[in-house]
């Protein structure tokens, strides 16, 4: 179907067909698919790619910029992830490019672990977990006229022992903004103990701040 045309500009369908449960993605079908910091890269003209029930884990050293998933496709292209799990520390997800949908997924990390610009990125019924005390969650870097990140019916949680972290390490004031919207989403109070760092003057404080558990 049109949601599974292959990866890497839609031309490497053999690689997509070679994926098997429990497989180490950098060495699919006997070939080293690595060579970069991202475990899985979706780029260029890649469109309507859908992942279901897939787990991706970063095996790079801790505190290293190494996405388990990096999306850099065209701004009007789309990807979907259903019941997927993403494990890393720094920069776990870079859902950039066009339109990205994460449904019933789990994402963990500790440093800007959901970051990058996109047209729109919807997380629906997902859990996002901070795993290290002193960490920071999001770094949006979205163009001002784009929707950016939307979290609907999600839960932002912290791992056992995490006492302080930052929800947002925001825009550096170079033209990108922190477009992040939370809808019916619960956020553990530890995410606000480290404050919100942003130079984006258009940011609106989160409503009901005092009611966050």
Which residues fall in each region the model found?
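Sequence-level preference for short, compositionally simple segments enriched
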Residues: 1-213
């Amino acid at each position: 179907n049109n949601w599974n045309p292959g990866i890497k500009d839609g031309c490497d369908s053999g690689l997509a067909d070679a994926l098997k449960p429990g497989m180490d993605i950098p060495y699919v079908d006997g070939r080293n698919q690595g060579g970069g910091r991202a475990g899985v890269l979706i780029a260029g003209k890649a469109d309507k790619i859908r992942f279901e029930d897939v787990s991706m884990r970063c095996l790079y050293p801790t505190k290293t910029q190494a996405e388990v998933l990096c999306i850099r496709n065209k701004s009007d292209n789309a990807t979907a992830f259903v019941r997927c799990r993403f494990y890393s520390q720094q920069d776990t997800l870079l859902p950039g490019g066009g339109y990205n949908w994460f449904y019933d997924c789990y994402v963990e990390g500790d440093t800007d672990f959901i970051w990058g610009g996109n047209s729109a990125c919807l997380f629906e019924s997902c859990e996002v977990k901070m795993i290290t005390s002193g960490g920071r969650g999001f770094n949006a870097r979205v163009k001002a006229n784009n929707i950016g990140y939307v979290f609907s019916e999600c839960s932002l949680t912290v791992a056992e022992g995490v006492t302080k972290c930052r929800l947002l390490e925001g825009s550096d004031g170079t033209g990108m903004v922190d477009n992040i919207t939370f809808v019916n989403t619960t956020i553990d109070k530890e995410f606000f103990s480290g404050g919100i760092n942003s130079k984006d003057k258009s940011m609106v404080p989160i409503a009901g701040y005092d009611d966050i558990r």
